[in-house]
Amino acid sequence: MNNELVLKTPDALSIHARVFHPESEVKAGIIINAATAVKQSYYQHFAQFLAQNGYLVVTYDYRGIGQSAIQDTRDPRLTMQAWGEKDLATVIDWATTHHPALDWHCIGHSVGGQILGLAANNTIFKSVYCVSSQSGYWANWEGIAKPRMFAMWYFAVPVLSTLFGKVPGVFLGGEALPECIAKQWA
């Protein structure tokens, strides 16, 4: 069983989350932090698997992404820093308020592992598992990937986000990335 939530951040944005409940006794809670431009629905089958194995799982869309997207893609509140400081912190507050007896763990995919340090209340996690949370710094890449990454960070992302107010999802292979987030990412 799962249910949907709408949580309010300290700066009054709505964060859409989904809670996956186990049918058996709850072993612990897990918060899944998504990758850049990836909707929470991408993790649905994994969250269901974890719930079937006794874990209460929370997935959510960061501000500007998926169900948490807003019309104004140039809103200055849309930053990657806010994903950790406000969005993740809000989800952690909900988790510890509604399920205070549980041990909480976090799975961070890509930037989802990197933003953990930005949430002031991140000390609740008993463990953290990060998947592909490496640096995207262009000079760390090898071969043809190195100039491609350089072009993406210093040309494509800044130009597309300035022209359109976002980087179109088709370019990223995921959701559109609002301008402020895209420029911070680059």
Regions found by a protein language model. Give the residues of each.
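N-terminal cap/lid segment of alpha/beta-hydrolase-fold proteins
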Residues: 1-22
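Alpha/beta-hydrolase fold active-site loops
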Residues: 27-28
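Conserved alpha/beta-hydrolase
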Residues: 40-72
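Active-site acidic short loop of glycosyltransferases
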Residues: 100-101, 125
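Alpha/beta-hydrolase active-site loop
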Residues: 77-98
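Active-site glycine-rich loops that stabilize anionic/oxyanionic intermediates
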Residues: 32-38
